[in-house]
Design a protein with these regions (language model features):
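Flexible "arm" and connector segments at domain edges
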Residues: 1-105
Length: 105
């Protein structure tokens, strides 16, 4: 891996592979499905004590594709989503509310 993509470069390249209709439904359900596949690998790790890192990495790539396409469908760049998330987490850290639950903490 010599050439590393930025989030936005990845998103633009991934958009060229998107061939679906009903964008929000397809990408939302696809994201849930791929996240479930990651969870399945973790479940098998708990059961068997072995984790196939490459298989999980490939599934994370699928998760990333769906996140990128969902962001595009909502007219956001991945870098904007990343910045919004870091702003939220930074605010929680400043307020001492990283732990706990709920979006508005």
């Amino acid at each position: 891996m010599t050439n590393k993509l930025t989030l936005d470069q990845y998103q633009k390249a991934a958009e060229k592979t998107a061939i679906y209709t009903d964008a929000l439904v397809y990408t939302g359900l696809g994201l849930a499905g791929e996240a479930g596949e990651v969870a399945d690998h973790i479940k098998k790790f708990l059961r068997d004590g072995e984790l196939n890192h490459e298989a999980v990495a490939k599934e994370l790539g699928d998760v990333l594709w769906y996140v990128a396409m969902l962001a595009s469908d909502l007219e956001y760049d991945l870098s904007e989503i990343a910045q919004m998330n870091m702003d939220k987490l930074s605010g929680r850290h400043t307020r001492g509310t990283i732990g706990g639950s709920g979006d508005e903490r």
